[in-house]
Regions:
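N-terminal capping/lid subdomain adjacent to the active-site entrance of alpha/beta enzymes
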Residues: 39, 43, 53-151, 155-161
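Catalytic domains of carbohydrate-active enzymes, especially glycoside hydrolases
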Residues: 159-175, 367
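Conserved beta-strand positions in the central sheet of alpha/beta enzyme cores
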Residues: 37-40, 63-64, 79-82, 95-103, ...
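Short glycine-/aliphatic-rich beta-strand segments at the starts of folded cytosolic domains
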Residues: 29-43
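N-terminal amphipathic alpha-helix/helix-capping segment at the start of soluble metabolic enzymes
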Residues: 1-31, 50, 75, 88, ...
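Active-site-adjacent loop and "lid" segments of alpha/beta metabolic enzymes
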Residues: 3-10, 46, 50-53, 57, ...
Length: 395
């Protein structure tokens, strides 16, 4: 007799059930083999008591704050721990409950049934994200933290675009304003001046073009000149930007940042109650704002904003638990390339962070990133290929 520990992965468990030779109906047991943990916040104590009992009756468990049983506290968060099968039983039991638990059951049901978007849809078509994509950085700026002044002449910009297209990049991200820590903002006129040639030159190629800007005037120019995606580091907090993108039906990347590039690394802007939940709440508000402006849900991309108002430790917490943001069922973009979070760990300057970048980007993809944003194109494309091969490797 031998025993083996199996990874609680849907495809892994399903494979073993089929290999064992179970009856076809018994393949549904795969639901029992994949653990599922869901945190429900701010539930009143009476409802939490019922939720805990119904969870236990469903074959799972619920952790609540001390004092809930006696109702000596008003509210608690509840950690529900089970698997797909037990959650389905819980949902049925909640359908007969009060104190808002019936509505909670409906929300849990929608969550279990929801499917991740494998396509980004927008006014010009569809971007397939069924496999990870590589976004190449083109900073037409004199002061970016890594490649400032490298691509400021028309010859250099053209050569960079030609190189990225030849190597097979999936998306080109053009930026005309540096967002490095402590950088100053510039006028939209100057930003447009910097990106104009790149937008004109890239039109000869059948290429998905993203423009990295938080200025709606720059975004308007970019969209009128071929841009497909607006990559907004301010997370669609500007009503003018939201309205513009809603009218154009472009794809939108919502990035999280506290403060502005000039002050985002100040102590006040790296403080969180809980960094994962705080960013989750930020995304929820930004997504609602976008939907209300007419931006399609499947047109959205999320970026937790590595290095934007985060300490080194916070960046790695986000990298480790990036998959938790897949609860939105939207593509995730990871912008880690050459950043100080890498240099701080390996003690290398910005020009010697390639190996660290490859490692971090691989981790990001394995933890849920659908798009990685890179300076080093060849290595970025190779990273995507290897990580995708790992993800699709089955027994």
């Amino acid at each position: 007799m031998k025993f083996y520990k199996l990874t609680p992965d849907y495809d892994r468990i399903k494979h073993e059930l089929a290999r064992i030779g179970v009856d076809s109906y018994a393949l549904n047991m795969v639901k029992k083999g994949v653990s599922l943990n869901i945190l429900v916040r701010d539930i009143k104590a009476p409802a939490a008591n019922i939720l805990k009992q119904e969870s236990i009756a469903s074959g799972m468990d619920a952790a609540v704050k001390k004092g809930v049983v006696s109702c000596s506290i008003d509210k608690t968060d509840v950690l529900l721990m089970g698997n797909t099968a037990t959650f389905e039983r819980l949902i049925k039991r909640l359908s007969m409950q009060v104190f808002g638990l019936k509505e909670l059951g409906k929300e849990l049901s929608l969550f279990l049934k929801s499917k991740e978007f494998k396509n980004i849809t927008y006014n010009k078509g569809v971007i397939d994200v069924s496999k990870p994509l590589c976004m190449g950085i083109l900073n037409t700026t004199p002061d970016s933290f890594s490649d400032g002044s490298l691509y400021v002449t028309e010859e250099a910009i053209a050569a960079r675009i030609d190189e990225m297209v030849e190597l097979g990049i999936d998306i080109v991200d053009i930026g005309g304003m540096s967002s490095r820590p402590f950088s100053e903002s510039i006028s939209s006129d100057e930003e447009i001046k910097r990106i104009k040639f790149a937008l004109d030159y890239i039109k000869q190629y059948d290429m998905i073009v993203s423009v990295d800007t938080n200025n709606y005037k720059t975004a308007e120019y970019a969209l009128n000149n071929g841009a497909d995606i607006i990559n907004d580091i301010s997370g669609m907090t500007d009503d003018n930007m939201v309205f513009l993108c809603g009218q154009s039906k472009c794809a939108v990347c919502i990035m999280h940042m506290q403060g502005s590039p000039k002050n985002m690394q100040n102590n006040a802007n790296t403080e969180y109650n809980n960094i994962i939940y705080d960013i989750h709440d930020f995304f929820t508000k930004s997504i609602d704002k976008c939907l209300n402006a007419g931006i399609g849900y499947s047109s959205l991309i999320l970026d937790v904003g590595f290095g934007f108002g985060k300490t080194v430790e916070q960046n790695y917490i986000l990298l480790k638990y990036l998959n938790e943001f897949k609860s939105f069922n939207l593509p995730l973009l990871a912008g880690i390339s050459r950043k100080s979070m890498i240099g701080a760990v390996i003690d290398k300057d910005v020009n010697n962070r390639l190996a660290g970048t490859v490692c971090a980007n691989t981790a990001a993809i394995l933890n849920g990133a659908d798009i990685i944003r890179v300076h080093d194109i060849k290595e970025g494309i190779d990273t995507v290929k290897i990580a995708d091969y790992i993800l699709k490797a089955y027994i």
